């Protein structure tokens, strides 16, 4: 870390000597946001210009998503530089797994909506995210434990939803695989406040056999001036019925598809599904006590009744055109309560300070009961039995309760006009109690697992931002160098489907260093950002085969993630409706110290090997021309090089390109017609690996088209 700090200090000194000093007149007075600059909240819990943040931050606007007909979280994030994602995961055919810095673990990232973690203290519940209601997405890379606690220990994605606005909007969508969608929103003045009503109805047959989906969601948002401050309340109701599709079994030594299996065929039990019935209420209140101090409070409760039925084949059991399969049917109920209270304060003391201090509580409970079952699948032709026709093999249940409480403080100090030092610390208390039971049919005794764990640990961060060139006209308008060091921890998530074998694993911890430069050129028409990162991850939870041949979650010792990311954007002043954005990322993600026992091959050492399914090099380019009226068009291309298939890197998956494009016509401020094609090259690459089914991968959806008509009045 001293190397990072020394490099930043030397670079700052040399560059300031070359360009000369150009400090702002008054460091205590916040500068207004420059033209074409993005304001970010997530990185510091207060409004900050992106170039003034000592870290890698990207913002995607909801208007941009709607103009590109985006309705899934994967489509919303896939063109962000360095983000590795795709549609499909253990949690459903429409639910992605998202990777940053080469880390693609489902629970490694914090996902928030309006300041509230979706899923509470458990794994991110991405089905709760309403993509149609997004105002903007803020992606902050690297550990965020200081401000956001144990869930933000490797990076975060925060979604801010739309507030009250004038008028009403209706969008009709139709496309491939019998996809139909209706989205409507209206805004109603209510005294001195405002009321916003919104709803979405979505139907699709799915591209994989027996993966029909129905997604109905709606809500109410109320905003009101109250007690000299601002109060908001958002109620959401979600009813998602998603038939579940199985991943594709692959041979570990070669990476080839197991003979007899085919892409887009569904080998899961007939009746497999991932359903959610969610009710949530989030309230927010902020009040300025003075020009220098503001109070902010967020309170949320969510209740999710689920139906989870999944099954996975045993690739090694293929014989005479059949394969053995096992599955679990559960009805979990998940509750989550979240409360955060903090103050924002600006004051003087050897320079200007912006202080954030507060406390947060996250509580959650998941209770479930269900059955396990075994059956046989016919491969050619496919013959899959219905869930109700399969004998019950065992009964299982679990009760998992988690409580996180943390106090935190973070200070941005400007001792000099050209220097900002940010330091923060957080202390978290974590408690978890787990009870799981399983009983085989015919066995008079049940297997019981009781486990509990308490931890109290610190997270923190220290960073410096050096303003080399500040808000000048001409060729180089702004140049900032930053260096940051951060550390965070989180409790590991048990695999609750393992019944009596479920256990609480060791907490995971990250330590990272980052150095970067952010520049603006040609009167802010051109942006160029460059960052280097290094992160050590201890006790990463991975899936391996247990002694019984079934997948099990284990701690994986130590991993190292390092690399660099470049992002450039160009928006000419003479053609402000045209935007060109591109970037390149180099991610080197490796096991540092990890050995495990394979039931067939014995002790294996993955130390020094790359993490499976993580690309070393990935790049993307997007060109858009989207004027407010008249014709518009856009296209986006992304690429990933070959990726290791297994933990000891015996086989690699081929590199791939993916291409999307769309055209539109805005007839006026009241009507817009658009057509979009995704994965136009029909590349069926792998997007994620199952953490439950051994050596089984989810495949990218095929070429598909979408037409959309939006009416505003």
Where are these regions (language model features)?
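N-terminal periplasmic accessory domains that precede
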Residues: 73-76, 96-99, 112, 127, ...
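C-terminal beta-signal and adjacent terminal beta-strands/loops
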Residues: 639-646, 664-713
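Transmembrane beta-barrel wall of Gram-negative outer-membrane proteins
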Residues: 174-203, 208-247, 271-294, 583
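Structural signature of Gram-negative outer-membrane beta-barrels, strongest in the C-terminal barrel
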Residues: 334, 349-364, 398-537, 624-628
């Amino acid at each position: 870390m001293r190397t990072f700090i020394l490099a930043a200090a030397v670079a700052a000194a040399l560059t300031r000597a070359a360009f000369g000093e150009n400090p702002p007149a008054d460091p205590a007075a916040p500068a207004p946001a420059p033209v074409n600059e993005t304001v970010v909240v997530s990185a510091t819990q207060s409004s900050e210009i992106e170039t003034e943040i000592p870290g890698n931050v990207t913002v995607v606007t909801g208007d941009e998503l709607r103009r590109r007909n985006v309705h899934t979280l994967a489509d919303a994030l896939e063109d962000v530089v360095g983000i590795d994602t795709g549609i499909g995961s253990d949690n459903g055919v429409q639910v992605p797994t998202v990777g940053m810095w080469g880390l693609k673990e489902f629970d490694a990232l914090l996902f928030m909506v309006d300041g509230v973690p979706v899923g509470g203290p458990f794994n991110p519940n991405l089905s709760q995210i309403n993509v149609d209601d997004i105002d903007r997405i803020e992606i902050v890379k690297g550990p965020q434990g200081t401000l956001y606690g144990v869930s933000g220990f490797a990076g975060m994605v925060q979604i801010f939803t739309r507030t009250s606005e004038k008028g009403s909007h209706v969008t009709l969508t139709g496309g491939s695989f019998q996809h139909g969608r209706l989205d409507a929103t209206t805004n109603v003045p209510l005294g001195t406040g405002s009321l916003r009503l919104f709803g979405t109805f979505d139907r699709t047959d799915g591209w994989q056999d027996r993966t029909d989906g129905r997604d109905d969601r709606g809500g109410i948002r109320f905003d009101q001036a109250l007690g000299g401050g601002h109060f908001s309340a958002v109620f959401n109701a979600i009813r998602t019925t998603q038939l579940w599709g199985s991943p594709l079994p692959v041979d570990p030594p070669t990476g080839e598809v197991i003979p007899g299996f085919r892409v887009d065929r569904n080998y899961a039990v007939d009746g497999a599904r991932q359903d959610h019935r969610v009710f949530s209420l989030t309230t927010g209140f902020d009040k300025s006590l003075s020009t220098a101090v503001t109070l902010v409070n967020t309170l949320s409760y969510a209740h999710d009744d689920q139906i989870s039925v999944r099954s996975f084949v045993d690739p090694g059991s293929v014989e005479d055109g059949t394969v053995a399969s096992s599955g679990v049917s559960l009805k979990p109920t998940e509750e989550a309560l979240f409360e955060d209270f903090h103050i924002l304060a600006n004051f003087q003391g050897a320079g200007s300070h912006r202080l954030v201090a507060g406390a947060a509580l996250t509580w959650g409970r998941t209770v479930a009961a269900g059955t396990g079952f075994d059956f046989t699948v016919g491969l050619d032709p496919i013959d899959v039995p219905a869930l109700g026709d399969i004998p019950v093999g065992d009964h299982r249940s679990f009760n998992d309760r988690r409580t996180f409480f943390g106090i935190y403080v973070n200070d941005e100090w400007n001792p000099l006009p050209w220097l900002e030092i940010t330091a923060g610390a957080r202390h978290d208390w974590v408690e978890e109690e787990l009870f799981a039971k399983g009983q085989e049919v015919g066995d008079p005794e049940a297997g019981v697992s009781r486990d509990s764990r308490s931890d109290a640990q610190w997270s923190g961060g220290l960073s410096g931002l050096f303003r080399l060139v500040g808000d000048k006209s001409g060729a180089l308008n702004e140049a900032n160098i930053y260096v940051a060091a951060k550390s965070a921890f989180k409790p590991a998530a048990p695999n609750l489907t393992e019944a009596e074998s479920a256990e609480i694993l060791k907490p995971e911890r990250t330590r990272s260093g980052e150095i970067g430069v952010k520049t603006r050129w040609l009167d802010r028409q051109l942006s160029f950002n460059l960052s280097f990162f290094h992160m050590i991850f201890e006790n990463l939870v991975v899936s391996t085969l247990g002694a019984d041949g079934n997948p099990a979650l284990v701690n994986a010792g130590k991993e190292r993630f390092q690399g660099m990311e470049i992002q450039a954007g160009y928006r000419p002043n003479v053609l402000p409706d045209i935007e060109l954005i591109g970037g390149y990322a180099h991610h080197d993600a490796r096991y540092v110290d990890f050995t495990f026992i394979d039931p067939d091959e014995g002790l294996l050492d993955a130390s020094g090997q790359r993490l499976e399914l993580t690309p070393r090099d990935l790049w993307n380019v997007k060109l858009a021309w989207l004027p407010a009226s008249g014709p518009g068009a856009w296209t986006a291309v992304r690429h990933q090089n070959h990726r290791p298939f297994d933990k000891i890197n015996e086989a690699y998956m081929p590199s791939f390109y993916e291409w999307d494009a769309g055209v539109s016509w805005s007839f006026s401020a009241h009507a817009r017609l658009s057509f979009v094609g995704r994965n136009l090259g029909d590349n069926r690459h792998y997007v994620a690996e199952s953490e439950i089914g051994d050596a089984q991968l989810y495949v990218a959806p095929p070429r598909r088209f979408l037409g959309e008509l939006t009416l505003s009045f």
